[in-house]
Structure formats: structure tokens, C-alpha cells
């Protein structure tokens, strides 16, 4: 049963303060909440599932009118606390049955970024992803990569794949391991821009020319990738729009507590730049 007493506060749980994608989502959320005279209560969980569950449990005790969860993965503990909540919840970035969700076309974005390199004649693709427990960034993007390979008549090869964390340093070290066991790669898909930037730095420090020796593409389209020493080809995800739509959806749920859960899927736009041999000299790299 949803409670009716209002505090005019909305809890927003985010996994990483340092993430540009999360910051863009929060910006979209904040604009809507400001317009509706709601305060935003922000909780950073530092990619810690236990802290995320604890944050949900804390907000359960009548401190907010609703919750927006920028999610990465779900555990049985997540399920238990989500089912116990008495305020409306919107999940961003993942799909979760029974709850309203705003999510990206992670499969399509990864497929398009990978296919772009294969269409340029590359035939030895590598993959730097994240844990498959993350159904969006990990699993869906991996499946998009695999699909692009199959469409090009190629077979995914496990020795050409590696799992990284959500940061540049891990991207660098996993690229080092990947190139060590699979020399001769001529293109590399990375699940996030941060991972790709680490891989780009590895290539630079080891004399691999991008894009001549190896092409690199990713998903996210963060601004730092646009101004890298070789600008990064990346599938633009509409993070700020995701935050905006999540907040508006939550406002609708507050107005109608009996509204059915909604699933909102956002599209992507592939931004082709020098890391795949494309010219982006006329692009406004500062736009969001």
C-alpha cells in the first residue's frame, strides 16, 4: 500500500559520483523536480551493492515521497527491499519486472558501434566489457557485440574478450592482458567510454596507432572521449533525457498511485570519430 503523506522529497540513488553518465541523468531529474517544487535527496553508493540495498531500506522509512534508482545490477537483497517499499519507484538504466523503468537500447548501441568497424573491413575484433551480472552494460552490450560479429560472418572468440571495471585504469590493464593473449586484433569494442579511454592510452604507450593498427569504439559518448588525443567513436545515449523521463514518470505515479508500471526504451545515435577513421571536425563536442 502506498502512503499518502507528502514530504516533497525524492530520493535518487546513484552508483558513481565520478560518472558523467550518472551526472547527466541527475541533471535531467533535478530540472523536473525543481519545476515541481520537490527537493532531491542524493545518495551515492560507490558501486557497492550492499550500500545500494541499505540506501533503499533507509528511504523506505517515510523519508521521501518517491525513489529514482540508477541501477547497475540486482541481487536477491534488492528484490526483497524493492518489494517492501511503500513509495513509488522508477528504475533507470535497467529493466526490472513489476516496476516502471527508463532504459537504453544497449544491445543496439553495441551492435551498431561494432558493426561500424567491421563494415570498414576489420576482421579481428576484441571486446572489453563489464560483468554480465549487469544486464544492461554487461550482458546486453556483449550480446550486441556478438550479434554484429555473427552478422559479419565471424564467430565470437573468448580469448579476444576481457572483463574490466568501470574506469580508465581497469581499461588500460585489461587491454594489456587482452593484447597479450590475442595479438593482432584490428578493432576493439569497449562497453563504456571510460574503459575505451584506458585502452586508447594503452595503445598510445605501446606504439599501436589508432585507427591505423586498431580501431576503437564504445558506448556512452562522454565529452572526455570527444577530445581525447584520438577522438572516440561512441554510441550516444540520452542520459539527461533518461533522467527527465524518469522524474516525469515518478510525478505521474505520485498523481495516480494506481498507474500501471511503464517501460520506456530510449534510442541511441552513433557518433563516428577518428578512432574508427572518421572525420568529426564539424562536430560541437561540448553538446550533451
Label every model-predicted segment:
Residues 14-24, 42-51, 102-112, 128-176, ...:
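Hinge/beta->alpha junction and helix N-cap segments in small-molecule ligand-binding domains
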Residues 1-9, 149, 280, 287-288:
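N-terminal helix-turn-helix DNA-binding module of bacterial transcription factors
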Residues 176-177, 181-288:
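Flexible loop/turn connectors
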Amino acid at each position: 500500500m502506498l502512503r499518502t503523506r507528502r514530504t516533497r522529497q525524492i530520493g535518487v540513488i546513484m552508483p558513481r559520483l565520478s560518472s558523467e553518465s550518472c551526472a547527466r541523468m541527475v541533471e535531467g531529474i533535478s530540472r523536473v523536480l525543481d519545476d515541481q517544487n520537490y527537493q532531491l535527496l542524493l545518495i551515492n553508493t560507490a558501486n557497492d551493492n550492499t550500500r545500494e540495498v541499505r540506501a533503499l531500506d533507509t528511504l523506505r522509512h517515510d523519508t521521501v515521497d518517491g525513489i529514482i534508482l540508477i541501477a547497475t545490477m540486482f541481487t536477491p537483497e534488492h528484490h526483497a527491499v524493492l518489494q517492501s517499499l511503500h513509495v513509488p519507484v522508477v528504475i533507470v538504466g535497467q529493466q526490472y519486472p513489476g516496476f516502471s523503468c527508463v532504459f537504453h537500447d544497449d544491445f543496439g548501441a553495441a551492435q551498431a558501434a561494432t558493426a561500424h568497424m567491421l563494415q570498414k573491413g576489420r576482421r579481428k575484433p576484441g571486446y572489453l566489457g563489464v560483468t554480465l551480472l549487469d544486464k544492461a552494460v554487461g550482458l546486453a552490450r556483449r550480446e550486441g557485440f556478438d550479434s554484429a560479429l555473427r552478422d559479419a560472418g565471424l564467430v565470437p572468440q573468448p580469448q579476444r574478450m576481457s572483463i574490466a571495471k568501470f574506469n580508465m585504469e581497469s581499461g588500460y590493464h585489461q587491454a594489456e592482458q587482452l593484447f597479450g593473449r590475442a595479438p593482432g586484433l584490428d578493432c576493439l569494442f569497449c562497453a563504456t567510454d571510460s574503459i575505451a579511454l584506458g585502452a586508447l592510452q594503452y595503445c598510445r604507450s605501446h606504439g599501436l596507432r589508432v585507427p591505423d593498427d586498431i580501431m576503437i569504439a564504445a558506448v556512452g559518448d562522454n565529452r572526455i572521449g570527444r577530445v581525447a588525443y584520438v577522438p572516440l567513436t561512441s554510441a550516444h545515449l540520452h542520459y539527461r533525457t533518461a533522467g527527465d523521463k524518469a522524474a516525469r514518470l515518478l510525478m505521474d505515479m505520485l498523481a495516480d498511485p494506481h498507474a500501471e508500471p511503464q517501460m520506456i526504451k530510449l534510442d541511441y545515435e552513433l557518433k563516428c570519430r577518428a578512432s574508427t577513421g572518421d572525420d568529426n571536425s564539424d562536430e560541437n563536442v561540448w553538446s550533451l
